[in-house]
């Protein structure tokens, strides 16, 4: 059986980890980074993911997608989506089923389809490390993700060619990463997870008995549309307002300028975590009839904190609710773990520390802990990790709509999963032959205030006065937190059941079509990779040849030099095209044309060696003081 990998599919950055022996290991991607920006660009020729996508975002803002996780499993008309429509440089549209989709080069795409590109890169990173195909994964989601968002995440995994063995909550994964090597005693841990697009708080009890560890989630709460992106947006809007005051021009109407502003705001926010002041300097940000305009704004840490103060305060209310749900007070919490890049902001750390009245743990990497926890859970599922039991909860209450548009709860929030619950209902009218089961998720009493997950009909109920038929509705939540609902007429035994896919979401046919599309692109991607390799080899050959020509100097006859330069020009022309065979052929011809250069280089080397021999013999008697030349690879520091 192949390895099951652990993936943290983040709003801003994603990360992949795998068990290496019995130790979780975060893997470096092709660029040498341990985290990958969750940015996907469609250039018209190819799909770029991560750092390459980020680099070209300024020149291709309308086809470069970031923070796509904020749209996953959401309806276009949702208030949170409408807020993003106004500020994102790319196009967010309403799909036929009412979902929020995006558009690139006129092609409409579902968020799971776009997120699948990030998952594919994570899959490839793991395959490069393991040297074998990877087909199974544990993927993390915010604890406060609803059923639709969890289902959409599983769809993204399928489109990427992964069987999602388990969906696990991000704070729970972080607690696994923290607690897996701490075998002693019992601990109650608060995991404060403020990532790029989502916020979660989970209260988790870690028990160690006779070498067995139990991670039990006592309560969870959060906001799936609050994160680092919102902090960035406050800064972006501030910069745009300052520019408008000074120049009477609104940069919000210019996608290219907004993309540059976004990059600058993110950079400034990160700098202000260690510096007390920074300057945003963007020359030629736009132009009008009077000429080009430049943006230069100084920002202090205090100014940034004042811009985002209410966002930080917004995270404190869920903390109070989670503690109340767990029936605990602040003094009952033993450790506080911070997860998510936005927790590096000093003001966030101060507020959380003051709320809990204790020092924060500093030994958990906020960018990598979630992926490490996912890899541990993957190890539990594959049997590589023993004596670990994970008891997660459902974040929101689940129920059905009953008479008077009331939500009747069958499963309360913070119930340990997997779980089952059933209740018997009846008809509202005499001789009613069918009932509609409308499944809801949320905490409001009124049905319309909750998230509609889907509905189905139970038909063929025997004629009877209202209140007489006995209809049993059963809810079954699996370990992924995904809901299965059934309704049974107790008298006739007629039953109807569904796995909730949300009232919208992707149909089975759509997911399969996207899987096929992804497989077709895999062939294209492989061909493109071969083309890039051929181009790189050709460029390398031209560079080396030019250097050899310089070194050869007068020793190279002019006719030979002319022949080589003609061959180099042919390579340059071929590299600009898309014909791999033509590039390889011209590279080979350049190698053949350069044979004279090789002869000259060899003769020169032999001559130098002959001169150095006596000197070398004299040196041999001395102690070895030579410095050995070595090539060192740059080890990139952990990024935000």
Curated annotation (Swiss-Prot):
SUPFAM superfamilies attached here? Actin-like ATPase domain, Heat shock protein 70kD (HSP70), peptide-binding domain
Keyword field contains Aminoacyl-tRNA synthetase: no
Q: Which family does it belong to?
A: Belongs to the heat shock protein 70 family.
Query: Which organism is this entry from?
Result: Shewanella sediminis (strain HAW-EB3)
Name the gene behind this protein. Answer: dnaK
Pfam family for this entry, one: HSP70
Protein name listed in UniProt:
Chaperone protein DnaK
The record's region (Disordered) falls at 601-640
What are the protein's UniProt keywords? Answer: ATP-binding, Chaperone, Nucleotide-binding, Phosphoprotein, Stress response
UniProt-listed CDD domains: ASKHA_NBD_HSP70_DnaK-like (cd10234)
Q: What does this protein do?
A: Acts as a chaperone.
Q: GO: which molecular function terms? A: ATP binding; ATP-dependent protein folding chaperone; unfolded protein binding
UniProt induction comment: By stress conditions e.g. heat shock.
Q: Which residues carry this modification: Phosphothreonine?
A: 198
Lineage, broadest ranks? Bacteria, Pseudomonadati, Pseudomonadota, Gammaproteobacteria, Alteromonadales
Comp. bias regions, Low complexity: 601-621
- List all Acidic residues biased stretches: 626-640
- Please indicate if the UniProt record lists Iron as a keyword: no
């Amino acid at each position: 059986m192949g390895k099951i990998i652990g993936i943290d599919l983040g709003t801003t950055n994603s990360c992949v980890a795998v068990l290496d022996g019995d130790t979780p290991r975060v893997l470096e991607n092709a660029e040498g980074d341990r985290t990958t920006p969750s940015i996907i660009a469609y250039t018209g020729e190819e799909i770029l993911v991560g750092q390459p996508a980020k680099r070209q975002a300024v020149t291709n803002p309308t086809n470069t997608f970031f923070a796509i996780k904020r749209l996953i499993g959401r309806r276009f008309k949702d208030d949170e989506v409408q807020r993003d429509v106004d500020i994102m440089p790319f196009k967010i549209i309403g799909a036929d089923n009412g979902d929020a989709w995006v558009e690139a080069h006129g092609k409409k795409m579902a968020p799971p389809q776009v997120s699948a590109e990030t998952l594919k890169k994570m899959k490839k990173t793991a395959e490069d490390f393991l040297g074998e195909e990877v087909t199974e994964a544990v993927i993390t989601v915010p604890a406060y993700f609803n059923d639709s968002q969890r289902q959409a995440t599983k769809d993204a995994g399928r489109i990427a060619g992964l069987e999602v063995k388990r969906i696990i909550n991000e704070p729970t994964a972080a607690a696994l990463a923290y607690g897996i090597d701490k075998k002693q005693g019992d601990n109650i841990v608060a995991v404060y997870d403020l990532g790029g697009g989502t916020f979660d708080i989970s209260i988790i009890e870690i028990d160690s008995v006779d070498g067995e560890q139990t991670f039990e989630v006592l309560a969870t709460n959060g906001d799936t549309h609050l994160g680092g992106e919102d902090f960035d947006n406050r800064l972006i809007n501030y910069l745009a307002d300052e520019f408008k005051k000074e120049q009477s021009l609104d940069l919000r109407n210019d996608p290219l300028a907004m993309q540059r502003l976004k990059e600058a705001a993110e950079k400034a926010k990160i700098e202000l975590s260690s510096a007390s002041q920074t300057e945003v300097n963007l020359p030629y940000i736009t132009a009008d009839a009077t000429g080009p305009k430049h943006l230069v704004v100084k920002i202090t840490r205090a100014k940034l904190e004042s811009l985002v103060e209410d966002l930080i305060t917004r995270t404190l209310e869920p903390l109070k609710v989670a503690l109340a749900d767990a029936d605990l007070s602040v003094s009952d919490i033993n450790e506080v773990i911070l997860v998510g890049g936005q927790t590096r902001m000093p003001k966030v750390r101060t507020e959380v520390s003051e709320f809990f009245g204790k020092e924060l743990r500093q030994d958990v990497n906020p960018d990598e802990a979630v992926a490490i926890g996912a890899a541990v859970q993957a190890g539990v599922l594959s049997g590589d990790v023993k004596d670990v039991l994970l008891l997660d909860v459902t974040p929101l209450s689940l129920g059905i709509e009953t008479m008077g548009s009331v939500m009747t709860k069958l499963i309360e929030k913070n119930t340990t999963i997997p779980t089952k619950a059933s209740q018997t209902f009846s008809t509202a009218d005499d001789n009613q032959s069918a009932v509609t089961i409308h499944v809801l998720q949320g905490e409001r009493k009124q049905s319309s205030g909750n998230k509609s997950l889907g509905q189905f009909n139970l038909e063929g109920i025997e004629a009877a006065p209202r209140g007489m038929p006995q209809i049993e509705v059963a809810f079954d939540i699996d370990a992924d937190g995904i809901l299965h609902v059934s309704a049974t007429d107790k008298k006739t035994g007629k039953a109807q059941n569904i796995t909730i896919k949300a009232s919208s979401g992707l149909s089975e046919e759509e997911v399969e079509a996207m899987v096929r599309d992804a497989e077709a692109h895999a062939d294209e991607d492989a061909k493109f990779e071969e083309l890039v390799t051929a181009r790189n080899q050709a460029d390398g050959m031209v560079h080396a040849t030019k250097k050899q020509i310089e070194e050869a100097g007068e020793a190279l006859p002019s006719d030979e030099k002319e022949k080589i330069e003609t061959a180099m020009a042919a390579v340059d022309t071929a590299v600009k095209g898309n014909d791999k065979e033509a590039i390889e052929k011209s590279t080979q011809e350049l190698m053949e044309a350069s044979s004279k250069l090789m002869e000259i280089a060899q003769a020169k080397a032999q001559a130098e060696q002959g001169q150095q021999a006596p000197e070398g013999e004299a040196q041999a008697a001395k102690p070895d003081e030579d410095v050995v030349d070595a090539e060192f690879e740059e080890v990139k520091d952990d990024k935000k």
